């Protein structure tokens, strides 16, 4: 029994003949021709070229200098040597090469939500509504506005009627004067004691009478016309 256990505990070694008979064996047995390579093991043979040329102290110093150079202001007192990386042209880290942080820092606008825009629009609409209610523009005019309009219309109509009547009177007088002058011209020209004909005397009398009717100071305004004109002016001032 012990010999049987000893034989079963020993694992059988796979040979090339077993690889040829792989199809006949169990699928759980892998052929020994598959390379046993772990791809996750890092190959130490591939390294950057600058790691072998630059000591570790120099690389650590350069990393620290790169991080601290962003906040450097003014002249630097650190003495640095020229360093080359992978054939890149040599350069020297001086205070002149480092841009000074004299400008303002980057400012970010505050985040504005869509709800803020909606509140702004609501405030604008409230302002418009408040102004409209103050001036009473909704569905009605200010108190007494319609009555003032009716008074303005009535005063305007009466003034127009008075002006029409006045123009009619003036035209009637002008027609009468023209008729009298025409009748006097058609009369026979007979000598008069003054040495003038009758027609000339009649024409001169009509001209004197018409000139006497006119006001030498210019056209006069009828009191009724002045009343309606003043009423129009007062109503327009009240509407403003």
UniProtKB/Swiss-Prot annotation:
Residues 202-218 have a biased composition (Polar residues). Keywords: Phosphoprotein. It comes from the Eukaryota. It holds the Pfam family DUF5315. Residues 1-27, 189-227 are annotated as: Disordered. The modification Phosphoserine is found at residues 59, 95. This is Uncharacterized protein YPL077C.
